[in-house]
Structure formats: structure tokens, C-alpha cells
Amino acid sequence: MFFSNKTKEVKTIAKQDLFINDEIRVREVRLIGLEGEQLGIKPLSEAQALADNANVDLVLIQPQAKPPVAKIMDYGKFKFEYQKKQKEQRKKQSVVTVKEVRLSPTIDKGDFDTKLRNARKFLEKGNKVKVSIRFKGRMITHKEIGAKVLAEFAEATQDIAIIEQRAKMDGRQMFMQLAPATDKK
């Protein structure tokens, strides 16, 4: 069976257990008016009549409550506002990715500067940077050289980054993680 993304999105909004008008199957409800005022506990038929007179919908917003809570509202407008809020929340969400910069224990000055420049670009864009050094062969016996390179890298980026995770070994790799420094002044 084929479902499009739009179908799934509509189902998630409608699937909030919000029963509308004739879908409500309870005897009495605690009723909330159009302006948010409490109208008390009313029989379902009376609540539906009030909603019909106002040309709006009766929406069951809390079916688990005793008695269930229903609100007189324009459901189309409510759904539109809900979708609008969801869209705003997705816009505000920023996706932070972790970029990796690979170094070697015997890296040359020019290569080091190039990797540093790339890492600075990533940090300025707001991404985190994982700096890793892979030890090949017998280089693993000289871990202090790798630690020195990572310390130099951290020192060179200290103006725009903070060390989120200090240098540590993981198998034949030593790595540290940098995060962009946030100035909240």
C-alpha cells in the first residue's frame, strides 16, 4: 500500500484523539466556551446545540478527564494554527552536524594550516568539529606526539571554539571534539 508524505502528516495532526461533533461518544462533557470561559458540565446534546448555534465545532480536547473536556471552537482554524506552530518550530530547530578533520602525527605546517582553515570554516558555520589523528604502524608508541598536535590545534582555535571533549584514545585513533564558542554578552 502506498502512502504519500502529505497523507502521513495529516494523519499525525488528526490523530491527536480530538473527536469532533458527531464523533464524540460520551453522555456529558465539561464545556469550555468560545472565549475560554467555563460553561460547566452539560449533556452532550446541549453542548452540540450550543456549538451549532454559534456555527462552530464541538471538539473533545481531553477525553481521559472525568467528565471529558470539550471546547466550542472553529476546528479548521485550530488545525491551521496548529500546523503553523509546527512549521515555526521546525524552522527554529537548527541541525548541528559534526564535521571531521583528520590529521596525522607527522603533519607538516602547510597541511596543518589547511586543516585548521577548514575547521575554522566549519566552526563559524555553527558545526561541531571532530579532530582525529590516526596512528599507523609503530607510530602508536608515540602517542605524546599526537597529543601535542591536538593541543596545538585546540590552541589555534581557542578564540572561536571550546573543547567539548578532551583528547582521548579510541583504538588506533586519538580524537577530540570542538564546539563553536557562543558569546552571550
UniProtKB/Swiss-Prot annotation:
Cell compartments where the protein resides: Cytoplasm
Keywords: Cytoplasm, Initiation factor, Protein biosynthesis
Entry-linked InterPro entries: T_IF-3_C_sf, T_IF-3_N_sf, Translation_initiation_fac3_CS, Translation_initiation_fac_3, Translation_initiation_fac_3_C, Translation_initiation_fac_3_N
Role summary: IF-3 binds to the 30S ribosomal subunit and shifts the equilibrium between 70S ribosomes and their 50S and 30S subunits in favor of the free subunits, thus enhancing the availability of 30S subunits on which protein synthesis initiation begins.
Family: Belongs to the IF-3 family.
Keyword Ribonucleoprotein in annotation: no
Keyword Cytoplasm assigned: yes
GO molecular function: ribosome binding; translation initiation factor activity
PROSITE patterns hit by this protein: IF3
Protein origin, superkingdom: Bacteria
Descriptive protein name: Translation initiation factor IF-3
UniProt subunit comment: Monomer.
GO annotations of cellular component type: cytosol; membrane
One BP term from GO: ribosome disassembly
